[in-house]
Amino acid sequence: MTAKFRKNLLLLLAAAAVGLSLYNGQLARRALAARPLGRFIHLRGTKLHFLEAGNGQPLLLLHGNGASAEDFTTSGIFGRAAARYRVLAFDRPGFGMSPRPAGRPWTAAAQADVIDAAVAKLGIGRYMVVGHSWGAAVALEMARRHRRSVAGVVVVAGYHYPSPRLALAISALPAVPLLGTVLRHALLPSLVRLNWHWAMKQIFHPATVAMPFAAMTRGLASRPSQLRSISAEPFLMLASALFPNRRYADIAVPVGIIAGAGDQLFDAKAEAVRLQSEISQALVDIVPDAGHMVHQSRPEAVLAMIDKIAALTSVGDRAEPSRSV
């Protein structure tokens, strides 16, 4: 291979990378433009986007890794819960329309603090919180760190006791500076779109894929900025596995724990039972014929658990606070 040939090859690859980056950027803008716009709240050098509906006891909904607030609208949980609760579905930092500022680790604890601060700025005193998958880790941190605010928790398909796994390390590679930047902008968006159907089958198995969720999330999850957040969360989970600092026994509020019996990502049933053993006021529901996306396949199970946990919270928590920002 001559020096001239190598030079031309590098130029060709660089041009292809730039072209792919521009194309992926255009698709990312289209994906954002296609989603419904909710409200923004600005605080702590960032902003959070959320959807809101209903009246009654405040109920926060936190999505998992790679998703956004629409996870709960497409499942029907958002609309059905709004008949009884004041529901706020957040885009967690780095997902949907909520940015994830660089320069600080967005751990579950950091996300818990900023979301609780946002809720307080909205004038809400006490609330319940539902978290799916990575959102479950944030919900539990909110219960531990903000005891005066959290009245009850429902965790869905949570990986509460992560172990060091090669898959976590590989998933975190796109978060690596320089190399990760090139991958996220040039190569990964196309790979994500090509493998989307396979990924959906894996997380929904043994249930069928919910097409409204799959269609809504595909464009958002393949954006370069969101791919950075998607890959950062396995890195944080790996760090948590290597240096565990879990104190679930500190949680003093009612907690509902839901897991799909057929979850293909990890042993969700064992995770749920172990978590129940650590929390004094915990209820467990292992849902048959459901996988990691149990809230999409069986939303009625999640809604029923929300009502059970709400019934265990004090009556005083049910007063609706001011909506002033």
Show the residue positions of the predicted features.
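Catalytic active-site module of serine/aspartate enzymes centered on a nucleophile-bearing elbow/loop
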Residues: S280-V325
